[in-house]
A protein has these predicted regions:
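PEST-like low-complexity, intrinsically disordered acidic/proline/serine-rich tracts
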Residues: 2-3, 32-265
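N-terminal secretory signal peptides that target proteins for export/translocation
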Residues: 1-16
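A composition/secondary-structure signal for short, hydrophobic, low-basic-content segments
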Residues: 9, 30-32
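Bacterial N-terminal signal peptides
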Residues: 17-30
Length: 265
């Protein structure tokens, strides 16, 4: 009887030696990882194609999200550089609010405006197209070097490369231009970047959102580089409608002439 009772107690005890094997089976049958679930192109790289809401800051604090140079994010200025960053309004809207006069928004302002963004991609290039002015940035993603001998431009020269599932876009050769929407918050000043601006963008999937980090390096103005994180939400329901037409010149009330502030669009 004692032996029989002991066998019953043994059979009631948990089989601890089975736990590692069960754990292995559970892990093997678990859902695929986030990396495996990413939309991918034919070459295996993440596919960012789609229409997204405008970038918004992650856990924002301070002014509106398009101001990437918020006080809590901006690096310290170099001595004497305040006059390069801040320019007083002079009454000429081509200087004070160039976008309202159909001039290019430039970068990074054009990327961070309050309109949708479409991304079109193939294994060689990615096209980032803001609805604002339809100013497409067509960026090679094969890791090639920057082009040489180009005139500085509003959107710079951009090249991309992959670091795992993150696309890294490096941009240089900018024309000195207005920086962001600071002129909407300060009636006396605008903010500008220098022609030494260098930006690095990092894009990667985080669920149905596209994580977007921009790093600003402007050695004529700031003592160091600094970054800010944004996110873009994928909107498949916007695919059928697409980006809307953005026409500025058709309503330009002073084309080719001398403009006044009241002539802004």
């Amino acid at each position: 009887m004692k032996k029989h009772a002991k066998r019953k107690r043994d059979s009631a005890q948990p089989k601890l030696w089975l736990f590692p094997a069960v754990l292995v089976l559970l892990l093997a049958n678990a859902a695929p990882s986030h990396a495996q679930n990413l939309p991918r192109m034919s070459d295996g790289k993440p596919d960012f194609s789609g229409i997204f809401t405008q970038p918004s800051t992650v856990n924002p604090s301070g002014p509106r999200g398009t101001l990437i140079f918020n006080a809590d994010k901006m690096a310290p200025l170099k001595p004497g550089a305040e006059s390069l960053l801040y320019e007083p309004r002079n009454g000429d809207p081509r200087h004070d609010e160039p976008r309202a006069m159909c001039l290019p928004a430039g970068f990074p302002d054009g990327m961070l405006y309050i309109l949708p963004i479409q991304i079109i991609q193939n294994p060689k290039y990615i096209a980032i197209i803001p609805e604002l002015q339809r100013a497409a940035r067509i960026i090679p993603t094969d890791g090639r070097p920057h082009r040489t001998g180009l005139e500085p431009s509003y959107y710079g020269d951009s090249v991309g490369k992959w670091e795992g599932d993150t696309l890294v876009v490096d941009s240089v050769n900018f024309k000195r231009w207005i920086l962001d929407d600071y002129h909407y918050t300060d009636p006396t000043k605008t903010r500008w970047h220098s022609d030494a601006l260098h930006t690095i963008e990092r894009l990667k999937w985080e669920g149905n959102k596209l994580s977007y980090q921009i790093t600003i390096d402007d050695p004529k103005i700031f003592t160091r580089s600094f970054s800010q994180d944004f996110e873009l939400t994928l909107r498949p329901d916007w695919d059928q409608l697409g980006l809307l037409e953005y026409v500025c010149e058709e309503n330009n009330r002073c084309a080719g002439g001398k403009c006044r502030a009241s002539d802004g669009q």
